[in-house]
Amino acid sequence: MYPTRPHYWRRRLSINRPQAFLLLILCLFFIHHCDASRFSSSSVFYRNPNYDHSNNTVRRGHFLGFLPRHLPVPASAPSRKHNDIGIQALLSP
């Protein structure tokens, strides 16, 4: 019932040098080929001197100040063209 060697699982999880080298090469390959939105992080702390940070107004035409709104979203309510059932829908004005 009990294993003859108490630490037998340590040997099963060990990795040899060729596997470690292959894992390192794959990690470097995938890290090198990841894309980011900007190349350097030097522009993170840039502040526009002409922008008033105390003014918390949201730009018009933008959703939460980030995404532009192109079309207004209609109200979600049942219409005569949709959400009707059977003959009652055909007979109702």
Swiss-Prot record:
What tissue specificity does the UniProt entry give? Expressed in mainly in buds. Lower levels in roots. Detected at the base of pedicel, in the floral and funicule abscission zones, in vascular tissues, in guard cells of young seedlings and in hydathodes.
Q: Which InterPro entries match?
A: IDA-like (IPR039639)
One Gene Ontology BP term is: floral organ abscission
UniProt lineage: Eukaryota, Viridiplantae, Streptophyta, Embryophyta, Tracheophyta
Q: Where in the cell is it found?
A: Secreted, Extracellular space
Write the signal peptide boundaries: 1-35
The lineage's top-level taxon is: Eukaryota
Q: Extra notes?
A: IDL4 is only partially redundant with IDA.
Record keywords: Secreted, Signal
What is the scientific name of the source organism? Arabidopsis thaliana
Q: What role is this protein assigned? A: May be involved in floral abscission.
User: Know the name of this protein?
Assistant: Protein IDA-LIKE 4
Tagged with keyword ATP-binding:
no
GO cellular component terms listed in the entry, alphabetical order:
extracellular region
